[in-house]
């Protein structure tokens, strides 16, 4: 078992990922440029990276082959990570996020619910370490904008203690809505 884990960690280190980071490839697209000799293809990859305990980021990489584009995206994602507060495997409160035409609502769920989400939003939640959440996306179904809208929503999350500190109150004095 540990041998398999070491192989996986070595693979992550070769790709430029730190040990302990989870990555999910959300989208790979192929672009064709027409040149005199025919078509020249290039690839773009969208990757979500997280540590499974509240850190998550996204990256977008382009190259002439798929593996280098994924590696570039992983490197960019590991540099753009944000912290997401987690409460018992879920999020502290309901929150909306938006990016372009994408609208995403994230709703906390009880233990055992699982991740109820589309493919792009699910990748972000899994990389972040969320186990129980309800989500709904509105507007576009473009995975790139859905990931950005999800991360916008996650950046707005605050714990009870953070809200109390902003208001200059004791966390016990806050009234649940």
Swiss-Prot record:
Domain S5 DRBM: 21-84
Molecular function GO terms recorded: rRNA binding; structural constituent of ribosome
Gene3D superfamilies to which the protein is assigned, alphabetical: 3.30.160.20, 3.30.230.10
Claim: RNA-binding is one of the keywords in the record: yes
Keyword annotations of the record: Ribonucleoprotein, Ribosomal protein, RNA-binding, rRNA-binding
One BP term from GO: translation
Family statement: Belongs to the universal ribosomal protein uS5 family.
Function, in words: With S4 and S12 plays an important role in translational accuracy. Located at the back of the 30S subunit body where it stabilizes the conformation of the head with respect to the body.
Free-text comment on this protein's domains from its UniProt entry: The N-terminal domain interacts with the head of the 30S subunit; the C-terminal domain interacts with the body and contacts protein S4. The interaction surface between S4 and S5 is involved in control of translational fidelity.
Subunit architecture: Part of the 30S ribosomal subunit. Contacts proteins S4 and S8.
Name of the protein: Small ribosomal subunit protein uS5
